[in-house]
Curated annotation (Swiss-Prot):
Its cofactor is Mg(2+). HAMAP family: IPP_trans (MF_00185). It catalyses: adenosine(37) in tRNA + dimethylallyl diphosphate = N(6)-dimethylallyladenosine(37) in tRNA + diphosphate. Keywords: ATP-binding, Magnesium, Nucleotide-binding, Transferase, tRNA processing. GO terms for molecular function: ATP binding; tRNA dimethylallyltransferase activity. It comes from the Bacteria. This is tRNA dimethylallyltransferase. It comes from Haemophilus ducreyi (strain 35000HP / ATCC 700724).
């Protein structure tokens, strides 16, 4: 029996994924699933470039606005939620179209999840107590002894990832690198994978800067002010660590000026795009590349590839 079909539409931030997905929704029997670790949060619309109400009316997206900003979400959660959504879409006779730039989520779907333990509140509390006394740099040094490869990939100030890496070791006796090498069950779908980006990096950088300034015009600072005023959120939460939000939060905390926040937000977004492109260039599966500056041709290429490889549309 043939596996059902799924489509991945990947790419760096500001590359035009949402516009292309909406155009495809009008021509193909697809339903969109968001693959974005920021779009899952409610009350975070402008700074995440979340599709507007008008856009969602044309192409409803699953897995957006599902969590409060104080909650955490992981690749494990996404894996379960996405598989459920994909099965539901397939059962309705349509094709799952997964759209976004959180590459770790795509990897989790394609390769399955490594057998990592669930969070343990007691161990996390002990790790945090140690950090409060000696600092996260001390724990990062400890991680260097336990798991040099993981430590080299984790910033010494990244408390969330340091905590998780140490927690995994204390729970299992094995380091994160060892455990993540143990592959899980692969995705039970035939997947056609596309990536969209401008051919010139300078064009992407310009789009990122223009979009950030547009978000400011739309009221991004006011959006973050409302989150800041809630009183139950803090800068170590995954939601507030999202690019743009972290910098606006620093401004509201009096740490940097608004101009600095905007500049740093643009720089952080460009760094995010660079990491996303690095993921894509090292991707193990075959990808069909699309040009952000030629959306009509990109749409035609996707439809042509689908007809040739999987289905008659």
């Amino acid at each position: 029996m043939n596996k059902p079909v799924a489509i991945f539409l990947m790419g760096p931030t500001a590359s035009g994924k949402t516009d292309l997905a909406i155009a495809l929704r009008k021509q193909l029997p697809v339903e969109v699933i968001s693959v974005d670790s920021a779009l899952i949060y409610k009350e975070m619309d402008i700074g995440t470039a979340k599709p507007t109400a008008a856009e969602l009316a044309q192409a409803p997206h699953r897995l957006i606005d599902i969590l409060d900003p104080k909650e955490s979400y992981s690749a494990m959660h996404f894996h379960a939620d996405a598989l459920h959504a994909m099965a539901d879409i397939t059962a309705s006779g349509r094709i799952p179209l997964l759209v976004g730039g959180t590459m770790l989520y795509y990897k989790a779907l394609l390769e399955g999840l490594s057998p990592l333990p669930s969070a343990n509140e007691h161990i996390r509390t002990e790790i945090e107590a140690h950090a409060n006394q000696y600092g996260w740099a001390s724990l990062h040094q400890q991680l260097t002894q336990i798991d040099p490869l993981a430590a080299s990939r984790i910033n010494a100030n990244d408390s969330q990832r340091i905590n998780r890496a140490l927690e995994v070791f204390y729970l299992t006796g094995k380091n994160l690198t060892e455990l993540t090498a143990q592959q899980g069950e692969c995705l039970p779908y035939q997947v056609l994978q596309f990536a969209i980006a401008p051919q010139e990096r300078a064009v992407l950088h310009q789009r990122i800067e223009q979009r950030f300034h547009k978000m400011m015009e739309l009221g991004f600072l006011t959006e973050v002010e409302k989150l800041y005023a809630r009183g139950d959120l803090h800068p170590d939460l995954p939601a507030i660590r999202c690019v743009g939000y972290r910098q606006m939060w620093q401004h509201l905390a009096g740490e940097i000026s608004l101009d600095e926040a905007i500049y740093k937000g643009i720089c952080a977004t460009r760094q995010l795009a660079k990491r996303q492109l690095t993921w894509l260039r090292g991707w193990r599966s075959e990808i069909t590349w699309l040009d952000s500056l030629d959306p009509t041709s990109s749409q035609e290429k996707m439809i042509q590839n689908l007809e040739q490889n999987f289905i008659k549309l």
